[in-house]
């Protein structure tokens, strides 16, 4: 069963965005960039160069900034004020809801060509406990499919 599609978008601490007068163009062009290197050879995983160029923006220092080896580390670094990260929506949502992270939604979301699935062996019915977990995960994933976050 498909649970949710994944997407990425720029995310940063509210304080950093305020330092840029709330202007996302300034933020992504001047603040340090946080690079998630967990999928460096995956053509579906967007990087800063691709994200910026699709929006007609440029930076001469694309490789500078923090390089992290896991997508949740990118979210944590952005929350800590280390710079702007391309964060996965599913990992950033909780911090966004709490106000610890702000994300660029309008024209900033890049959908990834992959989804999270819940799998079970074909022809084997789920136990009551497994069904409860499957229902819980499906319900938790629902806001991502309807909100785009």
What are the functions of these language-model segments?
Residues 1-38:
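Flexible hinge/capping segments at coil-to-helix
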Residues 14, 37, 89-90, 108:
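Short secondary-structure boundary segments
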Residues 2, 35, 67, 103-105, ...:
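Structural signal for conserved beta-strand scaffold positions within catalytic alpha/beta enzyme cores
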Residues 45-51, 68, 88, 116, ...:
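Tryptophan-centric aromatic hotspots in well-structured domains and transmembrane helices
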Residues 57-104, 111, 126:
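Hydrophobic hinge/microswitch elements
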Residues 32-55:
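Secondary-structure junction motif
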């Amino acid at each position: 069963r498909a649970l949710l599609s994944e997407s990425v978008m720029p995310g940063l601490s509210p304080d950093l965005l305020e330092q840029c007068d709330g202007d996302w163009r300034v933020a992504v062009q001047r603040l340090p960039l946080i690079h998630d290197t967990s999928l460096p050879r995956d053509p579906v995983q967007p990087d800063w160069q691709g994200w910026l160029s699709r929006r007609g923006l440029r930076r001469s220092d694309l490789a500078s900034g923090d390089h992290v080896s896991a997508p949740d580390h990118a979210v944590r670094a952005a929350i800590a004020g280390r710079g702007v990260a391309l964060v996965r929506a599913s990992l950033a949502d909780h911090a966004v809801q709490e106000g610890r992270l702000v994300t660029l939604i309008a024209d900033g979301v890049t959908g990834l060509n992959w989804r999270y699935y819940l799998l079970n062996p074909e022809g084997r019915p789920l136990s009551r406990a497994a069904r409860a977990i499957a229902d819980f995960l499906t319900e938790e994933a629902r806001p991502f499919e309807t909100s785009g976050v």
